[in-house]
Protein backbone atom coordinates (compact mmCIF):
# COMPACT_ATOMS: atom_id res chain seq x y z
CA UNK A 1 0.00 0.00 0.00
CA UNK A 2 2.85 2.37 0.84
CA UNK A 3 4.54 1.60 -2.48
CA UNK A 4 1.37 2.55 -4.36
CA UNK A 5 1.10 5.80 -2.44
CA UNK A 6 4.78 6.62 -3.01
CA UNK A 7 4.51 5.84 -6.73
CA UNK A 8 1.38 8.00 -7.10
CA UNK A 9 2.91 10.93 -5.23
CA UNK A 10 6.14 10.77 -7.22
CA UNK A 11 4.21 10.68 -10.49
CA UNK A 12 2.08 13.64 -9.41
CA UNK A 13 5.21 15.63 -8.49
CA UNK A 14 6.77 14.74 -11.84
CA UNK A 15 3.69 15.96 -13.68
CA UNK A 16 3.31 19.17 -11.70
CA UNK A 17 6.93 20.14 -12.21
CA UNK A 18 6.84 19.43 -15.94
CA UNK A 19 3.50 21.21 -16.50
CA UNK A 20 4.49 24.29 -14.53
CA UNK A 21 7.22 25.09 -17.05
CA UNK A 22 9.94 24.63 -14.47
CA UNK A 23 13.40 23.81 -15.76
CA UNK A 24 13.99 21.34 -12.92
CA UNK A 25 14.70 17.88 -14.26
CA UNK A 26 13.38 14.92 -12.32
CA UNK A 27 14.89 11.51 -12.89
CA UNK A 28 12.98 9.11 -15.13
CA UNK A 29 10.89 6.45 -13.37
CA UNK A 30 9.95 2.82 -13.93
CA UNK A 31 6.18 2.55 -14.47
CA UNK A 32 4.64 -0.90 -14.82
CA UNK A 33 1.16 -2.40 -14.96
CA UNK A 34 -1.58 -0.33 -13.36
CA UNK A 35 0.92 2.43 -12.52
CA UNK A 36 1.76 2.79 -16.21
CA UNK A 37 -1.90 2.92 -17.21
CA UNK A 38 -2.67 5.49 -14.49
CA UNK A 39 0.26 7.62 -15.62
CA UNK A 40 -1.01 7.51 -19.21
CA UNK A 41 -4.49 8.58 -18.06
CA UNK A 42 -2.99 11.51 -16.17
CA UNK A 43 -0.63 12.60 -18.95
CA UNK A 44 -2.97 12.13 -21.92
CA UNK A 45 -6.22 13.23 -20.31
CA UNK A 46 -9.18 13.44 -22.70
CA UNK A 47 -6.99 12.73 -25.73
CA UNK A 48 -6.69 9.13 -24.63
CA UNK A 49 -3.75 6.87 -25.37
CA UNK A 50 -2.67 3.81 -27.30
CA UNK A 51 -1.82 0.85 -25.07
CA UNK A 52 -2.11 -2.81 -26.00
CA UNK A 53 -0.30 -5.10 -23.58
CA UNK A 54 1.09 -8.31 -25.04
CA UNK A 55 -0.99 -11.41 -24.46
CA UNK A 56 0.56 -14.17 -22.42
CA UNK A 57 1.12 -17.10 -24.77
CA UNK A 58 1.76 -19.79 -22.15
CA UNK A 59 -1.92 -20.86 -21.94
CA UNK A 60 -2.00 -21.18 -25.73
CA UNK A 61 0.95 -23.58 -25.88
CA UNK A 62 -1.29 -26.49 -24.85
CA UNK A 63 -3.22 -26.14 -28.11
CA UNK A 64 -0.15 -26.39 -30.35
CA UNK A 65 0.95 -29.80 -31.62
CA UNK A 66 4.27 -31.05 -30.28
CA UNK A 67 7.23 -30.81 -32.65
CA UNK A 68 8.62 -34.08 -33.88
CA UNK A 69 11.97 -34.57 -35.53
CA UNK A 70 13.90 -31.38 -36.20
CA UNK A 71 17.57 -30.71 -36.77
CA UNK A 72 18.56 -32.20 -33.41
CA UNK A 73 16.68 -35.42 -34.18
CA UNK A 74 18.36 -35.93 -37.54
CA UNK A 75 16.14 -33.88 -39.85
CA UNK A 76 18.66 -33.03 -42.57
CA UNK A 77 16.69 -30.28 -44.31
CA UNK A 78 15.45 -28.51 -41.18
CA UNK A 79 17.02 -25.39 -39.71
CA UNK A 80 17.85 -25.18 -36.02
CA UNK A 81 14.94 -23.67 -34.11
CA UNK A 82 16.83 -20.66 -32.72
CA UNK A 83 19.28 -20.01 -35.56
CA UNK A 84 18.07 -16.44 -36.16
CA UNK A 85 16.99 -15.55 -32.62
CA UNK A 86 19.52 -12.71 -32.20
CA UNK A 87 18.48 -11.04 -35.46
CA UNK A 88 14.77 -11.31 -34.57
CA UNK A 89 15.30 -9.74 -31.15
CA UNK A 90 16.98 -6.74 -32.77
CA UNK A 91 13.98 -6.25 -35.07
CA UNK A 92 11.41 -6.05 -32.26
CA UNK A 93 10.02 -2.52 -31.91
CA UNK A 94 10.19 -1.06 -28.44
CA UNK A 95 6.75 -0.54 -26.94
CA UNK A 96 5.70 1.47 -23.93
CA UNK A 97 6.29 -1.46 -21.58
CA UNK A 98 9.87 -1.83 -22.79
CA UNK A 99 10.33 1.94 -22.68
CA UNK A 100 8.75 2.70 -19.29
CA UNK A 101 8.67 -0.54 -17.30
CA UNK A 102 11.86 -2.37 -18.23
CA UNK A 103 13.71 0.95 -18.46
CA UNK A 104 12.88 4.26 -16.76
CA UNK A 105 10.97 6.87 -18.76
CA UNK A 106 9.90 10.48 -18.31
CA UNK A 107 6.71 12.40 -18.98
CA UNK A 108 7.78 13.21 -22.55
CA UNK A 109 8.12 9.50 -23.30
CA UNK A 110 4.58 8.97 -21.99
CA UNK A 111 3.23 11.80 -24.15
CA UNK A 112 4.42 9.94 -27.26
CA UNK A 113 1.68 7.36 -26.62
CA UNK A 114 -1.18 9.87 -26.40
CA UNK A 115 -3.70 9.97 -29.26
Curated annotation (Swiss-Prot):
S-S pairs: 32-101, 44-114, 100-105
InterPro entries per record: Insulin, Insulin-like, Insulin-like_sf, Insulin_CS, Insulin_family
Cell compartment(s), UniProt: Secreted
Keywords: Carbohydrate metabolism, Cleavage on pair of basic residues, Disulfide bond, Glucose metabolism, Hormone, Secreted, Signal
Signal sequence annotation: 1-22
PROSITE patterns to which the protein is assigned, alphabetical: INSULIN
GO cellular component terms, semicolon-separated: extracellular space
GO MF term list: hormone activity
Any one GO biological process: glucose metabolic process
Broad class of where this protein is predominantly found: secreted
Propeptide: 56-92
Family: Belongs to the insulin family.
Task of the protein: Insulin decreases blood glucose concentration. It increases cell permeability to monosaccharides, amino acids and fatty acids. It accelerates glycolysis, the pentose phosphate cycle, and glycogen synthesis in liver.
Subunit structure: Heterodimer of a B chain and an A chain linked by two disulfide bonds.
Protein name: Insulin
Gene: ins
Amino acid sequence: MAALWLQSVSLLVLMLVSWSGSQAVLPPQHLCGAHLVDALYLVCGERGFFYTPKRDVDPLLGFLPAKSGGAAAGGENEVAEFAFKDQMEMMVKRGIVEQCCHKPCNIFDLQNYCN
